Swiss-Prot record:
It catalyses: CMP + ATP = CDP + ADP; dCMP + ATP = dCDP + ADP. GO terms for cellular component: cytosol. This is Cytidylate kinase. The keyword Transferase applies. It comes from Mycobacterium tuberculosis (strain ATCC 25618 / H37Rv).
Length: 230
């Protein structure tokens, strides 16, 4: 049974803040559903790459995005992402998609379609934790609970590099740091839905916090806010 009365918990922030893992754990603690909107942009990006299109070709990206068929699970303990019925949960996390997703997600038509889909997917019984980059500012600007996670670029690069090494990839902190800074620039300067905290969001710097500490802090924030809106 859900411990949350507020319908939507919006969690935004750049990559490497622990956003995805924290959001999943928070949803589990709250007994809420979970929606990873970043995975949706990755699915569209994978569709673009599979079609052999250039991610910077706006017309081609728009055409592909308008017809792409996707579905995602709501279980915070799972990672079910499907493209045209095929499980692509692992493939969308690959380097090729990671390098191209910023270009694809900056296309206005892509964001328009996915925002509509995100709002539809969030409907249903119970509460939902939605994580992304424009949830509190664009997708659910009226969400009763808005949280923006942040951390220094260096901290986020260390975390991402450690994940790569643990997964058997090369130890390349400098390369990861450069990619983090590049992604930050692209996300914060794009014309449509730039990455920024909502004016009424609670900003949490996770640089010196463990994942468990962040989850405990957010659980307290969400519970307190939920009680306030009852």
């Amino acid at each position: 049974m859900s411990r949350l009365s507020a319908a939507v918990v919006a969690i935004d922030g750049p990559a490497g803040t622990g956003k995805s893992s924290v959001s999943r754990r928070l949803a589990r603690e709250l007994g809420a559903r979970f929606l990873d909107t970043g995975a949706m942009y990755r699915i569209v990006t994978l569709a673009v790459l599979r079609a052999g299109a250039d991610p910077s070709d706006i017309a081609a990206v728009e055409t592909i995005a308008s017809t792409v068929q996707m579905s995602l699970g709501y279980d915070p303990d799972g990672d079910s992402c499907y493209l045209a019925g095929e499980d692509v949960s692992v493939e969308i996390r690959g380097d090729a998609v990671t390098r191209a997703v910023s270009a694809v997600s900056s296309v206005p038509a892509v964001r328009t379609r996915l925002v509509e889909l995100q709002r539809t997917m969030a409907e249903g019984p119970g509460s939902i934790v939605v994580e992304g980059r424009d949830i509190g500012t664009v997708v659910f600007p009226d969400a009763p609970v808005k949280i923006f996670l942040t951390a220094s670029a260096e901290t986020r690069a260390r975390r991402r590099n450690a994940q790569n090494v643990a997964a058997g990839l090369a130890d390349d902190y400098d390369g990861v740091l450069a990619d983090v800074r590049r992604r930050d620039h692209l996300d914060s300067t794009r014309a449509v839905s730039p990455l920024q905290a909502a004016g009424d969001a609670v900003i949490v710097d996770t640089s010196d916090m463990t994942e468990a500490e962040v989850v405990a802090h957010l659980l307290e924030l969400v519970t307190r806010r939920s009680e306030a809106v009852r």
